[in-house]
Amino acid sequence: AQKRISTAALLPDIKGKVTAERELENHGGDAFKKSETFEAQFLVSWELDLWGNLRWARSASIAEYLQSVEAQRALRMTIVAEVAQAYYELVALDTELDIVKQTLKAREEGVRLARIRFEGGLTSETSYRQAQVELARTATLVPDLERKISLKENDIAFLAGEYPNRIARSRLLQEFNFPETLPIGMPSTLLERRPDIRQAEQKLIAANAKVGVAYTNMFPRLALTGGFGTESTSLSELLKSPYAVMEGALLTPIFGWGKNRAALKGKKAAYEAELHSYEKSVLTAFKETRNAIVNFNKIKEVYALRANLERSAKSYMDLAQLQYINGVINYLDVLDAQRGYFDAQIGLSNAIRDELITVVQLYKALGGGWKQ
């Protein structure tokens, strides 16, 4: 709307006016004298943009409009990124809960075996009680994870503009696919994609245009006004009495107590501030992108290492359980192996989650993703 208003200011303003007037006069006599006047006219006013004042104002309005467009795009991109990250975190919690429930079953089996061996005199009561402690400790993790899952579902519903409800999902974290490489072009293409940089650029353009407006306000302004119409004392004779009026007005500042110069100085200061803000936005964009790329590459290394750790911990736990059944080691060694495998599983799940989140962060850093 503001863009259209500023554009219209460059064009002549045309208005129409129709009037009818009736007067009754009595100058001391008994009868009233009636007089009627009918008039139809077009009024035209036009400010000539001699110094570019109106053009600068139009440029500022267009830039401010584009600011709002980029702000909307930035908000949409942020919401998409936040929803994606929250969803990956939710599925990671699902995976962790699944791991805990599997571990809980293993702990229950461990308690059963420890009780049988204790009652058979093969082990002490300590091993049996320790197995019960581990079972109880693992069981406490279930309601806490269920609480976190419900809260995360509420977060996603809020971001989606919905009332809290269950979020539909059908995948475990390990089933998501993520890119092996990042086909990113030259960093300068960031300037073409990131809405925050585009918004900062439009703010800079608007600030520069406002400097132009303040500067041209110190020069005279020429306005033309005209009227074209017809006037008559009889409605039937209205079109037979045309007239036309044209005048010009030159308005120039003479003594304004330094108001215009102060305004110009203020707009220049605002421009300098927007220039620094633009430079900061560009530097922030490159920093965030670089951080996202580093995180993506390093998290892949972390994932590979944790996957290897998970496999090794699984082999160690299987061996420890076999040796315990054969009486080679005590139950504390089995518990230690089980704890190690549990931690390795959670660590691997977190690595997958972190890798997916880095893709989301990279999507946001690149202003909405990249082309394959």
Where are these regions (language model features)?
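A glycine-/polar-enriched beta->alpha junction
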Residues: 1-12, 25, 41-60, 70-77, ...
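Short terminal targeting/anchoring segments
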Residues: 126, 330-350
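Transmembrane beta-barrel strands of outer-membrane/channel proteins
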Residues: 16-22, 224-230
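Metallo-beta-lactamase
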Residues: 145, 195-196, 274, 351
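Acidic, low-complexity, intrinsically disordered peripheral segments
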Residues: 164, 178, 326, 347-372
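Periplasmic alpha-helical coiled-coil/stalk elements that build and connect Gram-negative outer-membrane
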Residues: 54, 63, 70-186, 295, ...
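Residues that define the transmembrane beta-barrel architecture of outer-membrane proteins
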Residues: 34-38, 242-244
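Bacterial Sec-pathway N-terminal export signals of envelope proteins
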Residues: 1-2, 175-205, 253-254, 279-282, ...
